Design a protein with these regions (language model features):
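C-terminal edge-of-domain segments
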Residues: 49-71
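Residues that cap or initiate secondary-structure elements
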Residues: 9, 36, 69-71
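A generic structural signal for short, solvent-exposed coil/turn residues
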Residues: 22, 44-46, 55-57
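Intrinsically disordered, low-complexity sequence elements enriched in Ser/Thr/Gly/Pro
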Residues: 4-7, 42, 60-62
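An N-terminal amphipathic alpha-helical segment
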Residues: 1-25
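Amphipathic alpha-helical interaction surfaces in cytosolic regulatory modules
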Residues: 11-19, 35-50
Length: 71
């Protein structure tokens, strides 16, 4: 699943990222133009079994989240 948050306000992006992290996903990509999101994601997934890979491409961030264990 790929979620593009670039057209949302920062507060709406934060809500959506929280929803995604708290959901039962196997793999998802988040595209954002807000650096604040990039700083918050690692803190939010610290105690969860989620791998994170971030790339800066074409003036936006792409964050790939992968669940380490699939139930």
């Amino acid at each position: 699943m790929e979620v593009d948050l670039r057209k949302l306000k920062l507060s709406d992006q934060l809500k959506k990222v929280n929803e995604i992290i708290d959901s039962d996903f196997i793999e998802t990509s988040i595209i954002t133009n807000e650096e604040a999101i990039i700083k918050i994601i690692p803190m939010q997934i610290l105690n969860k079994k989620i791998k994170c890979k971030m790339k800066f491409i074409d003036d936006c961030w792409k964050v790939n989240l992968v669940a380490k264990e699939v139930a």
